[in-house]
Amino acid sequence: MPTINQLIRKGREPKERKSKSPALMGNPQKRGVCIRVTTMTPKKPNSALRKVARVRLTNGVEVWAYIPGIGHNLQEHSVVLVRGGRVKDLPGVRYHIIRGALDAAGVEGRKQGRSKYGTKRPKEGGKK
């Protein structure tokens, strides 16, 4: 326990916060190239085949990124935009691919929550 005098002289050093998405290096998004597009099985109570991609970012770091939405057009050498955000039931997947940006097309036939999946507004045929 420091004395009051020691605290006046030196002060307390704030703890450094550890990033949850270190590969982005402080950027909101990073561009990358898909190395491998595959599926993963989730942790214990859940069961599915989640679509993921191994992405090499422009800074040379390779990460696993989740492909959200139903259906996708990604394959090897697709250029994608990656954001932070983990997938709770997939260990090691700490990033998301942004749909509707670069080579990742938006989700087809989506009516609600379109902005999260890069889907354009559907053409209205009469009434709203």
UniProtKB/Swiss-Prot annotation:
GO MF annotation, one: rRNA binding
UniProt cross-references to InterPro entries, sorted A to Z: NA-bd_OB-fold (IPR012340), Ribosomal_uS12 (IPR006032), Ribosomal_uS12_bac (IPR005679)
Annotated keywords: Methylation, Ribonucleoprotein, Ribosomal protein, RNA-binding, rRNA-binding, tRNA-binding
Presence of the UniProt keyword ATP-binding in the record: no
Pfam families reported in the protein's UniProt record: Ribosom_S12_S23
GO cellular component: small ribosomal subunit
Record PTM 3-methylthioaspartic acid, positions in chain: D89
Start and end residues of each stretch annotated as Disordered: 1-30, 106-128
GO biological process, one term: translation
Disulfide bonds: none
Record's function text: With S4 and S5 plays an important role in translational accuracy.
Oligomer and partners: Part of the 30S ribosomal subunit. Contacts proteins S8 and S17. May interact with IF1 in the 30S initiation complex.
HAMAP family linked: Ribosomal_uS12_B (MF_00403_B)
Family stated for the protein in its record: Belongs to the universal ribosomal protein uS12 family.
PANTHER family found in the cross-reference section: 30S RIBOSOMAL PROTEIN S12 FAMILY MEMBER
Descriptive protein name: Small ribosomal subunit protein uS12
Species of provenance: Dictyoglomus thermophilum (strain ATCC 35947 / DSM 3960 / H-6-12)
Lineage start: Bacteria, Pseudomonadati, Dictyoglomota, Dictyoglomia, Dictyoglomales
